[in-house]
């Protein structure tokens, strides 16, 4: 085999390897997943990993926030992992919504209160809405959703 043949073969190996590397890089960069449509909620301020987090999505004021079992458009229970939780609502039509979230530590499906009616478990609302001597109104917690990907955070209070 002549000297030029070995050089040519070596060059082809290098060129081929570089080409495959470039193809792999382009496929990796080009395959980044776009954000999925839906409402993606990160729950902050969870004090422990006991129980679950309940996220209730409402599209009307009726039943907000305490009547979530009857009136919520979507309800999601997610396990708390290392004091973190995320609720991802998919297939949601564009519109106006409000979110209510509780940290259901005892997993009884409701916000536990003491003898005075004060919450003993964590709770929070979209827009960080707060009520005066009670839960906030739907209007205070409401937000517009356009059908694309919406990310929000809700900080719990205890």
Question: Residue spans of the language-model regions?
Answer:
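Bacterial N-terminal signal peptides
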Residues: 11-27
């Amino acid at each position: 085999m002549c000297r030029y043949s070995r050089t040519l073969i070596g060059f082809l190996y290098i060129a081929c390897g570089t080409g495959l590397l470039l193809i792999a890089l382009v496929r990796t960069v080009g395959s980044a997943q776009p954000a999925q449509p839906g409402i993606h909620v990160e729950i902050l301020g969870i004090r422990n990993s006991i129980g679950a987090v309940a996220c209730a999505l409402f599209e009307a004021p009726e039943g907000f926030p305490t009547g979530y079992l009857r009136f919520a458009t979507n309800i999601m229970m997610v396990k708390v992992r290392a004091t973190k939780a995320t609720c991802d609502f998919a297939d949601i039509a564009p519109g106006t919504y409000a979110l209510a979230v509780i940290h259901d530590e005892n997993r009884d499906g409701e916000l536990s209160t003491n003898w005075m009616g004060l919450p003993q478990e964590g709770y929070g609302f979209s827009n960080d809405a707060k009520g005066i001597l009670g839960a906030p109104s739907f209007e205070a917690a409401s937000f517009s959703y356009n059908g694309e990907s919406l990310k929000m955070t809700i900080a719990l209070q205890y």
